[in-house]
């Protein structure tokens, strides 16, 4: 089955040489292609050739990814042809300026609200899984982090964790990033110290529930932001972000959450294996199990998606598919095993629907890549919003339509829109200031009225005060 990966990989290489290398892998289209290749490779490694259902699943996934790449490539060529045929000047992907957003009262108010919401949530729950795990490790009595984590999200008491996550995992760290960039570029010592403290609070909030997915996604968002801030170039110093920040936090969480308990591996190796499993194994195992589970069920015609979207509403548990699949794998409902993106599409709209949606995704993500970041200037708030949208859509490997919403798509879109409104206001003020400086100065009302004085204007396109003569 692994040979099925090679033609898709070859098509992806062609797509990279023609299109992706122009705008970079850290774009909605580029990141989606990379993640889907990882998903396909990891899945094909697990497929049992003797199972017709699993073989069909592998073929279905390979065909869907190939259709996506083909549609994306055709869309890219169409956009380039349209630009070449038009009289408009060609726009490059890196011809823009970046301005920094300062800590306005509105931004600071949203930061405070995010901190209050996060603190109120953990106060209501009564504990932080991360802090309890750290306390247990220090005391020599490791806590049952899996149970604590599950109780905080799906216990008897419901404290709207999905809504809290929008503040805790998206808005707070994103605004902290904006303020850190401003303080180290324009601010003084006090501003830098305050931004570092805010960053520490944001990182603790990301890790507090004992789930590292949000941390990994935001570190990737920081990488995309750095790439865009430097006009689609990734400085070598930016590569230190995963090493200097990501690796220590992954090691700490591995130690605190006791993921390597009973293992003779070093914490570094355990963290690396855990990260490898997250991208190459875990989602693939879950997706394969979900497809085996749903293959004998009738097509839902979008019903399971509607259940999942209804789960966004307060108090609604949403779709139970992931919990049902988890039960078939582990004999317990105290966890979730979501289907893959393509498995979810097939379960909801069958094979023909999957073909259409795969092609549609290729068109939409390519247009998102092409039609954004083409203005003359952007600000840091816009960039962090677009970076988050890029990561949320680009890493969409598992789950249905509710998955991007749960991991912050709407919140990042809101930050993007907020930043664009800020830029529009700045451009309006800039044009108004320019118009005022070009307006002729009025003649003084007292000119020629004071006895013994006369006003002698000079001949120029702008009236100026002349010389006073007795």
Can you annotate each of these PLM segments?
Residues 3-10, 14-22, 45-49, 107-119, 163-177, 180-185, 201-209, 335, ...:
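Hydrophobic alpha-helical transmembrane segments
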Residues 84-233, 248-263, 327:
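Membrane-embedded catalytic interface detector for glycan/lipid assembly enzymes
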Residues 1-114, 195, 218-257, 399-436, ...:
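N-terminal "leader" segments that precede or initiate the main folded domain
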Residues 10-13, 175-178, 197-203, 221-225, ...:
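Hydrophobic, membrane-inserted alpha-helices
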Residues 137-162, 251-366:
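Small-residue-enriched transmembrane helix-hairpin modules in multi-pass membrane proteins
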Residues 23-36, 189-195, 372-386:
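Membrane-interfacial loop-to-transmembrane alpha-helix junctions, especially the N-terminal start
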Residues 337-343, 347-437:
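Hydrophobic alpha-helical segments
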């Amino acid at each position: 089955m692994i040979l099925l990966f090679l033609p898709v990989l070859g098509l992806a290489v062609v797509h990279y040489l023609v299109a992706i290398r122009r705008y970079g892998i850290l774009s909605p289209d580029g990141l989606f292609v990379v993640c889907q290749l990882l998903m396909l490779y990891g899945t094909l490694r697990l497929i049992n050739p003797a199972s017709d259902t699993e073989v069909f699943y592998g073929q279905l996934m390979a065909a869907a990814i190939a259709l996506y790449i083909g549609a994306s490539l055709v869309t890219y060529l169409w956009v380039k042809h349209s630009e070449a045929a038009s009289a408009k000047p060609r726009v490059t992907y890196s011809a823009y300026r970046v301005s920094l957003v300062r800590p306005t009262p509105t931004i600071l108010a949203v930061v405070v609200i995010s901190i209050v919401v996060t603190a109120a949530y953990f106060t209501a729950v009564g504990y932080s899984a991360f802090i309890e795990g750290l306390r247990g490790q220090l005391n020599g009595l490791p806590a049952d982090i899996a149970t604590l984590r599950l109780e905080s999200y799906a216990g008897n008491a419901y404290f709207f964790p999905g809504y809290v996550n929008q503040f805790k995992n998206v808005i707070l760290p994103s605004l902290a990033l904006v303020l850190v960039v401003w303080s180290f570029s324009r601010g003084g010592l006090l501003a830098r110290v305050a931004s570092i403290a805010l960053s520490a609070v944001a990182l603790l909030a990301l890790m507090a529930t004992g789930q590292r997915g949000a941390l990994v996604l935001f570190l990737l968002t920081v990488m995309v932001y750095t790439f865009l801030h430097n006009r689609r170039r990734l400085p070598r110093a930016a590569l230190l972000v995963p090493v200097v920040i990501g690796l220590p936090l992954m090691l700490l969480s591995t130690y605190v959450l006791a993921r390597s308990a009973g293992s003779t591996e070093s914490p570094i190796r355990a963290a690396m294996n855990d990260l490898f499993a997250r991208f190459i194994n875990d989602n693939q195992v879950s997706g394969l199990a979900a497809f085996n589970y749903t293959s004998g069920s009738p097509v839902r015609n979008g019903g399971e998606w509607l259940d999942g979207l209804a789960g966004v509403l307060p108090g609604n548990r949403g779709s139970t598919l992931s919990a049902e699949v988890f039960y078939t794998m582990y004999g317990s409902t105290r966890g979730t095993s979501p289907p893959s993106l393509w498995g979810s599409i097939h379960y909801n709209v069958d094979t023909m629907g999957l073909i259409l949606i795969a092609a549609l995704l290729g068109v939409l993500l390519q247009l998102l890549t092409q039609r954004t970041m083409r203005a003359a200037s952007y600000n840091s708030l816009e960039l962090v919003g677009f970076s988050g949208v890029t990561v949320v859509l680009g890493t969409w490997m598992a789950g249905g339509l509710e998955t991007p919403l749960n991991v912050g798509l709407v919140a990042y879109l809101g930050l993007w829109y907020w930043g664009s409104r800020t830029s529009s206001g700045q451009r309006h003020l800039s044009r108004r200031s320019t118009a005022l400086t070009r307006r002729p100065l009025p003649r003084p009302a007292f000119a020629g009225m004071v006895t013994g004085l006369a006003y002698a204007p000079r001949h120029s396109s702008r009236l100026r005060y002349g010389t006073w003569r007795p």
